[in-house]
Amino acid sequence: MAIREILEVPDPRLKTVSEPVQPDEFNDDLKQLVDDMFETMYAAPGIGLAAIQVGVPKRVLVIDLQEPDMDAEPEECGHDHGDGEGAHKHYPVKNDPRIFINPEIIDPNEELSTYQEGCLSVPEIYADVDRPKTCTVKYQDLTGKTHQEDLDGLLATCLQHEMDHLEGILFIDHLSRLKKQMALKKLKKMRQAA
């Protein structure tokens, strides 16, 4: 596994429409790509990554919401200075790595939900985006087997966000022209300050 470079705006490759993974491409190279994508996403850290974000124009995306495991025993973190201050407990993260190859939304819901989205390719910029609250997705796994699944909540939103990447669309493209310009200006200022 290897951590790959994540493309950031204004890299023109992010506007590329990704190609489907062909039947003869379900092989060790694809498995390596997926492994690298997970490692890259976790290192960033993020909850979703499309192959085009690491420069590979294929219809592959990975998601792991990394939600707290509320069924597990809380773990202590921080440093206790003997006075009870500083140490606190948190729930360990429950990893649920998901792989979607050649995903296709076949039944988007008309009811919308709003999430504040961010993107590893548009670092440190967040904005509210409206998307269908639920959707049905058809996709393939690493073996090429086809699955169909109903998604809702953050998973549905994340999937739709990552699927936009496969079409060369960034979450800021859903914003008004003014909000998009403001976001890009803020990103430019942050880069100049760094």
From Swiss-Prot:
It is an enzyme of class 3 (hydrolase). Residues 71-93 are annotated as: Disordered. InterPro entries: Peptide_deformylase, Peptide_deformylase_sf. It holds the Pfam family Pep_deformylase. Residues 76-93 have a biased composition (Basic and acidic residues). Its cofactor is Fe(2+). PANTHER family: PEPTIDE DEFORMYLASE (PTHR10458:SF22). Belongs to the polypeptide deformylase family. Removes the formyl group from the N-terminal Met of newly synthesized proteins. Requires at least a dipeptide for an efficient rate of reaction. N-terminal L-methionine is a prerequisite for activity but the enzyme has broad specificity at other positions. This is Peptide deformylase.
